[in-house]
Design a protein with these regions (language model features):
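A polyanion-binding, active-site-adjacent surface
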Residues: 1-177
Length: 179
């Protein structure tokens, strides 16, 4: 977790994976490289917590299932810390909600709970209505290679959502350049 009361953008993901668990650096893996490319930011800017906060739904590595995939984030982090933490961050203008756990939490927190039946394509594809929330939410698939098929099957994601993401990121982090 990396948080500052000056960051206007928060990356809300699932939980640290195995590489992040080993290094202690969030998104310090190929998924992070892809996320930074999607956002059009350098590693230096990405890890500048005065500009970009990183708050996963789980603060610790949850372990692996039988298929060697990460287990869901542990609920106690969200239950104990998230509501109070986000109450201390009124300056946020944009939440990048990466994956369903973060999306479910943040949309519900802003009074717009997602239907259980909503698909990733429906959630991510509704980006125009999410832009009317305060703070705005941009829902993304996890930037893992495991979502390559979804990304290829939904070309509108790269054509419509990524330009919106880049614009939101640029706006949210620009304040520091002139502050």
């Amino acid at each position: 977790m990396r948080v500052s009361t000056t960051a206007r953008l928060v990356l809300a993901g699932q939980a640290p994976g195995t590489r992040v668990n080993a290094t202690g650096i969030p998104y310090n893996d190929p998924s992070g490289d892809r996320l930074r490319a999607w956002m059009n930011v350098s590693r230096e800017t990405f890890y500048d917590e005065s500009r970009i906060a990183i708050v996963p739904m789980g603060f610790c590595f949850p372990g692996l299932n039988a298929q060697k995939a990460d287990l869901p984030p542990r609920r106690e982090c969200r239950q104990l810390w998230h509501d109070g933490l986000f109450d201390l961050l009124p300056q946020l203008t944009c939440i990048v909600a990466i994956g369903r756990y973060a999306q479910d939490y943040h949309f519900a927190r802003l009074g717009r709970p997602l239907p259980k039946s909503a698909t990733l394509a429906e959630i991510v594809g509704d980006w125009k209505s999410h832009a009317r929330l305060t703070p705005r939410i941009i829902a993304l698939p996890h930037p893992s290679w495991r979502n390559n098929g979804w990304i290829k099957g939904n070309p509108w994601f790269e054509e419509k959502v990524l330009p919106r993401l880049r614009a939101e990121v640029a706006e949210a982090i620009a304040w520091k350049a002139i502050a």
